[in-house]
């Protein structure tokens, strides 16, 4: 987010971007932390119980997807994005993304992002921590983001350090280090 803001301040065109910081509230109001910890209880002992891990992960993904945002939060989300689209959604600082054509699809994509953090690979990567740090999600009005070598060169010069720019129709969508992240 900081690099996108800096690029915009330097006069580079940035895709319309909304920062959605609802994950902590979503988890708290749906009692997800306790529910998910209960699902994974007994999975990680001296050895990882792979069968229980698979079942717990499946149930965790389902629990997150079936949980609700506060109605007023969902309505505000839809209202802000009304008449806009398509969208790319991703966690700030991460490259993996979800696509959505409409605001309603973007709302479902937001919950998919939340639930993906409980797939087996993601859980194992974070172990021993089950609940990931709550991170804002960027919702960007763009259809696709591809590496743009010309914008990368221009922004690298302006910032005084090497960066890689991903853009959609000349608008910056993501800026990252050439070494990842």
Language-model region placement:
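Conserved catalytic alpha/beta cores of large enzymes that bind or transform nucleotide phosphates
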Residues: 167-181
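Conserved, well-ordered active-site substructure
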Residues: 147-164
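Low-complexity, intrinsically disordered short peptide segments enriched in small/polar/basic residues
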Residues: 8-11, 162, 170-172
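N-terminal beta-alpha lobe that positions the nucleotide/phosphoryl donor
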Residues: 1-147, 152
